[in-house]
Amino acid sequence: MDCLFCRIVAGDIPAHKVYEDDQVIAFNDIAPQAPVHFLVIPKKHIATLHDLSEKDDKELAGHMLITAQRLAEQQGCQDGFRVVMNCNDQGGQTVYHIHMHVLGQRQMHWPPG
């Protein structure tokens, strides 16, 4: 499998990690769209949100959200932040390994674009 994020998990590609545990890694986005912009990804390869299993991945999905919230607060986003997940081409997904973008420390607008 030639998955960019799996290669980051394996340590084959460097990333500026801000957090890691046995289930997830969080690292700064290479093209930040806000003063704070990091990704939270599972170590387990799951290509899209359609591939999540309620039976097997419910705890992992919850852990990703809690990790995003905790790290956003640690990075000074107490006034608010945005969490974005894209799914498939029409949803804007470009890396087929689920991931959350967490953006903060600036005013967010709607619609996003």
Residue ranges and their predicted role:
Residues M1-G113:
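HIT superfamily nucleotide-processing domains
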